Design a protein with these regions (language model features):
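Glycine/proline-centered helix-kink
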Residues: 49-62, 118, 193, 225, ...
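Interfacial helix-cap and linker-helix signal at transmembrane-aqueous boundaries
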Residues: 59-68, 125, 199-200, 231-232, ...
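Alpha-helical transmembrane segments of multi-pass secondary-active solute transporters
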Residues: 41-42, 71-76, 138-142, 210, ...
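Small-residue-rich alpha-helical segments with characteristic i,i+4
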Residues: 272-348
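Hydrophobic transmembrane-helix bundles of small-molecule transporters
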Residues: 65-180
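Transmembrane core module of solute transporters
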Residues: 164-285
Length: 421
C-alpha cells in the first residue's frame, strides 16, 4: 500500500491499474511490453528501498553504539509518529469510492495462522542447534505447532470460497522457478557472515565498525541496479542476468577464500561486500519480473505472499542456520586438529607459552596464575586460527555452490508461457 501511494504522489501514476484483475494485456506483444517496463521499473524500486534499509541498519548501529540499545526503540516510535504526521499533512484530501473503511479484516484469522506457522518454523531453525534439537521440549512443541497450523491453514484455504491464498498460483512454471531462484539467492547470500566473522575474529572490530563497513553495499546496490536496468532495456535474456548475479556472489566468496588470513586488511573488506551486493541486486530485482511473466493479476497477492515467505523468512532462516551450524562444526574440527600438535615439544608454541608465563610473572602474577593465563592465550590463538580456516573452507564451498547455480540457470529452458485467463 505504501509503495503504491508513493508512486501515486511522486510519479503521478496510478500503479494499481497495472495489477487490477481484468486489466491484463490481451496479446503476447502486450505482455512482452509489460515485462520490459517491469524490468526497468522494479530495479529502480528495489534500489530505493534497499538503500533505505541499509541506511536504517547503519543508523540503528550508530544509536546502539553512541547511546543504549533502548534508544533504537525510542527513535523508531518517534519516527513512526513523524510519518503519521507527514501523511496527514501531505495527503489530506484522499477520496475513497465508498464510505466504508478500505481495510478488510475478514481474513485476519487466516493470516494469523499462517504467521504462527512461519514463527514456529523460524524458531526451530534458529534455536535448534543451541537447544540440541528435539531433546528440548520447546523445539518439539514448535514443530507440532508448525505442522498443526500449516495443515489448518491449507484446510481453511481449500474450503473457503474466497481464499486468502490461491494455491493455483503454484501451477505456474515461472512462479515455481521464481521461488527456487529466491531460495538459492537468499541461502547463498547468508555467506555475507564471512566478512563479519573475519573482521570480528581477525581484526577485533565491534558491531558499529562492521555496520559502517556494510555501508559499502549501497555502492553495490547502485551498480547492480543501473546494470540491471540497462541490460534489461537492451533485451538481454533472463538466464544471462541470473547467471551474472550468481557469478558475482561466487566472486565475493572467492575473494574471501584468498583474503582470509591472520594479517588481513580492513580496507580490503569493502570489495567482497560491493561484489556480493551487486550480484544480489541483479537477482533480487529481476526474479519477480521473470516469475510474473504473463501471470493473471488475480494471483498477484498469492505470489507476493509466497515470495515474501521464501525471500524474507524461510530462505534467510535456513541459510543462517546452515552457515552458522556448519561454521561451528568446522571450527570445532579445526580446533581439535590444531590442538593435537600444540605442546611443549612444539618449538613455536613452547616459546610463546614460556614468554607469556614470564610476562605474567613480571606483572606480579603467581606461577599458577601465569600458567593459566598462558594456556588461555594459547587456546585463543588456536580458536582464531580454527575460525579463519573454517571461513576459508566454507568460502570455497560457497564458490562451488554459486558456480552450480550459475550453470543451472543457464541450461534451464525459458519457454514463453501460454496466455491464461
Amino acid at each position: 500500500v505504501n509503495l503504491f501511494t508513493l508512486i501515486k504522489y511522486a510519479g503521478h501514476m496510478e500503479a494499481t491499474e497495472k495489477i487490477t484483475p481484468g486489466n491484463e494485456p490481451l496479446t503476447g506483444k502486450g505482455w512482452d511490453k509489460l515485462d520490459i517496463e517491469r524490468s526497468a521499473a522494479q530495479p529502480a524500486i528495489y534500489l530505493f528501498f534497499m538503500v533505505l534499509g541499509q541506511l536504517g541498519t547503519s543508523l540503528t548501529a550508530w544509536l546502539t553504539y553512541e547511546y543504549e540499545w533502548q534508544y533504537v526503540y525510542y527513535f523508531m516510535m518517534g519516527l513512526l509518529l513523524l510519518c503519521i504526521l507527514i501523511t496527514f499533512v501531505t495527503m489530506p484530501y484522499h477520496k475513497y469510492t465508498t464510505r466504508r473503511f478500505p481495510i478488510n479484516f475478514k481474513q485476519f484469522g487466516n493470516a494469523s495462522i499462517f504467521c504462527i506457522t512461519l514463527t514456529c518454523i523460524t524458531y526451530v531453525l534458529t534455536y535448534g542447534k543451541v537447544l540440541d534439537w528435539y531433546d528440548d521440549p520447546t523445539i518439539q512443541w514448535a514443530t507440532v505447532g508448525a505442522v498443526v497450523a500449516g495443515i489448518l491453514f491449507v484446510h481453511i484455504e481449500v474450503t473457503l470460497r474466497n481464499p486468502y491464498y490461491q494455491f493455483d498460483v503454484l501451477k505456474l512454471r515461472t512462479i515455481r522457478f521464481g521461488f527456487l531462484f529466491y531460495f538459492l539467492l537468499m541461502v547463498l547470500n547468508s555467506s555475507s557472515m564471512f566478512v563479519n566473522v573475519f573482521t570480528g575474529i581477525g581484526m577485533k572490530l565491534d558491531n558499529y565498525q562492521n555496520a559502517t563497513l556494510g555501508n559499502w553495499s549501497m555502492l553495490g546496490y547502485f551498480i547492480g541496479g543501473i546494470a540491471t536496468i540497462w541490460l534489461s532495456v537492451k533485451g538481454v535474456h533472463f538466464k544471462y542476468l541470473f547467471a551474472a548475479g550468481f557469478l558475482f556472489l561466487g566472486l565475493s566468496a572467492m575473494f574471501m577464500y584468498f583474503e582470509v588470513q591472520g594479517a588481513g586488511l580492513y580496507e580490503r573488506m569493502k570489495y567482497p561486500i560491493i561484489i556480493r551486493s551487486t550480484g544480489m541486486m541483479l537477482l533480487y530485482s529481476l526474479i519477480p519480473t521473470f516469475a510474473t511473466q504473463r501471470m493473471p493479476y488475480k494471483y498477484l497477492s498469492s505470489w507476493i505472499c509466497t515470495m515474501l515467505t521464501v525471500r524474507m523468512v524461510l530462505a534467510p532462516s535456513i541459510g543462517t542456520a546452515l552457515y552458522s551450524n556448519v561454521l561451528q562444526e568446522r571450527q570445532q574440527h579445526y580446533i581439535t586438529r590444531y590442538a593435537q600438535n600444540v605442546d611443549m615439544m612444539h618449538p613455536e608454541a613452547s616459546a610463546s607459552f614460556t614468554q607469556t608465563v614470564q610476562g605474567m610473572q613480571y606483572q606480579g602474577k603467581s606461577k599458577q596464575e601465569a600458567v593459566n593465563m598462558a594456556a588461555i592465550s594459547t587456546k585463543g590463538r588456536i580458536q582464531v586460527q580454527a575460525t579463519l580456516s573454517a571461513v576459508k573452507e566454507m568460502a570455497g564451498w560457497t564458490l562451488y555452490a554459486c558456480l552450480f547455480c550459475m550453470i543451472f540457470v543457464v541450461v534451464l529452458p525459458y519457454p514463453k508461457r501460454k496466455l491464461l485467463t
